[in-house]
Amino acid sequence: MRTAILKKVKRIVIKIGSRVLTGDENGLNHAFIARLAAETASLRQQGRQVIVVSSGAVAAGRRELGIEGRPKSIPQKQAAAAIGQSRLMRAYEEDFGRFGHKVAQILLTRDDLANRRRFLNARATLDTLLDFGVIPVINENDTVVVDEIKFGDNDNLSALVTNLAEAHLLVILTDIDGFYDSDPRANPDARLIHLVKSITRETERAAGDSGSSVGTGGMVTKLAAAKKAGQFGVPTLMLNGTVPGILTKAFAGREVGTLFLPARESLNRRKHWIAHTLRPSGRVIVDDGARTVLSRQGKSLLPSGVIRVEGEFDRGACVRVCGADGAEIARGVVDYSHAEIERILGHRSGEIEAILGYKYGDEIIHRDNLVVL
């Protein structure tokens, strides 16, 4: 199965973890970058396109600025990123250039992908670079980013880039051999799982509670990235990037690392964008009847099923749809603002125009703009 899947892959997103790229965290691991360049050249010779999602800018800049340990403030981190980006790209340019490959830097914030026009423009730029044989190196724009427009981590960014680039495979290079059934650093009997057919609640528990910021070898965010990529119909391959030749071994059919199969029912591009790229602005709370209809029948959300609205948002915003117990059941783009929904909630669709004096449609959220989670 693995060989058949990898044989069809033409466009790959490779996410490089900071521990792999910075080694002892005293700067960039130049030996790793040289190996990556050689293995990427081999993939290119096989007719595959490669996109790199890279950490390392802050670590590289921190050393240049003489900052010991992690930056103690956001301005320090952003200053380190500003100087580190050029150092990082110089390293990629030198090592990839030895194989005749050009690299290009793309810095993104969540806003760039949440805006549909900028999202499509970024996709066109990626396609053009790949058509010219250039290897894009993507990172979050740490120099200007604030909490409101952060991706959160580069694992999440790599999953969103997989959608953006319409890639066929996400590769996550980390510093452990793959996904284990428990923390291999705490449990010497932890078992490496080579194939994950579906990411279930049990899988998430093995990685650590999904609501926690820590997990099995940093596995929580990596598992979330694999799940997001899988919902777009893309498999994820998790490999130990500290092992020389690991990409070559994987694409030669060796059973290394962990392969996560994609979801059986994948989301289309727009719904994946709604579910994972847009930042929700508020919450729409629905009754049990609406919850059942949304979850099981894939219907639109009508005002009659809404019991209250939380937060302030305009028409066209993304919101969380939650049950009366507070559990999130869906996300969607609303056809009415929070103020309008407050006036029409609990009413039939036929009453909307009489209440508001106008009508955008029968639905609070049309099913084409609604993603059940």
Swiss-Prot record:
NCBIfam families assigned to the protein according to its UniProt record, in alphabetical order: proB
Catalytic function, reaction form: L-glutamate + ATP = L-glutamyl 5-phosphate + ADP
Main location: cytoplasm
GO molecular function: ATP binding; glutamate 5-kinase activity; RNA binding
Binding site for substrate: 55, 142, 154
Sequence similarity: Belongs to the glutamate 5-kinase family.
Protein name, per record: Glutamate 5-kinase
SMART domains: PUA
Superkingdom of origin: Bacteria
EC number assigned by the record: 2.7.2.11
Pathway: Amino-acid biosynthesis; L-proline biosynthesis; L-glutamate 5-semialdehyde from L-glutamate: step 1/2
Keyword Transcription: no
Compartment list: Cytoplasm
Residues that, per the record, bind ATP: 15, 174-175, 216-222
UniProt cross-references to InterPro entries, sorted A to Z: AceGlu_kinase-like_sf (IPR036393), Asp/Glu/Uridylate_kinase (IPR001048), G5K_ProB (IPR041739), Glu/AcGlu_kinase (IPR001057), Glu_5kinase (IPR011529), Glu_5kinase/COase_Synthase (IPR005715), Glutamate_5-kinase_CS (IPR019797), PUA (IPR002478)
Domain PUA positions: 281-359
Entry keyword annotation includes Transit peptide: no
Function as written in the Swiss-Prot or TrEMBL entry: Catalyzes the transfer of a phosphate group to glutamate to form L-glutamate 5-phosphate.
UniProt keywords, alphabetically: Amino-acid biosynthesis, ATP-binding, Cytoplasm, Kinase, Nucleotide-binding, Proline biosynthesis, Transferase
Pfam families named in the record: AA_kinase, PUA
Biological process annotations from GO: L-proline biosynthetic process
Gene Ontology, cellular component aspect: cytosol
